[in-house]
Amino acid sequence: MARKQVSRKRRVKKNIENGVAHIRSTFNNTIVTITDEFGNALSWSSAGALGFKGSKKSTPFAAQMASETASKTAMEHGLKSVEVTVKGPGPGRESAIRALQSAGLEVTAIRDVTPVPHNGCRPPKRRRV
């Protein structure tokens, strides 16, 4: 029996010059998503997606690599300048921003959008190791 041919969607090159780089830096991982001004994702990468496992995901080097790969694929769409929003307290915050600059993107603004509770939910109990 002959198999049906599945038509695959080709990745279309978008000509977007300014975008927003969302860096989510937790204690366990760093996720970098680069979007256009409206929030539509152009490219994304994370330390876990690059093959870092366990505690190696939370290193600044892993955040740097994730930021570099996300910026390279976004620059293929014509991205030149980027605003950076950083969320979370993780160790990969600064190194991810530096990697965006060294990849050739012009960083126009850096915003910290870490959510801070106004005494909301009770935090989890302290770890005793």
Swiss-Prot record:
GO molecular function, one term: rRNA binding
Keyword entries, A-Z: Ribonucleoprotein, Ribosomal protein, RNA-binding, rRNA-binding
GO annotation, biological process: translation
UniProt cross-references to Gene3D superfamilies, sorted A to Z: Ribosomal protein S11 (3.30.420.80)
InterPro entries named in the record: Ribosomal_uS11, Ribosomal_uS11_bac-type, Ribosomal_uS11_CS, Ribosomal_uS11_sf
Family per similarity comment: Belongs to the universal ribosomal protein uS11 family.
Function according to Swiss-Prot or TrEMBL: Located on the platform of the 30S subunit, it bridges several disparate RNA helices of the 16S rRNA. Forms part of the Shine-Dalgarno cleft in the 70S ribosome.
Stated name of the protein: Small ribosomal subunit protein uS11
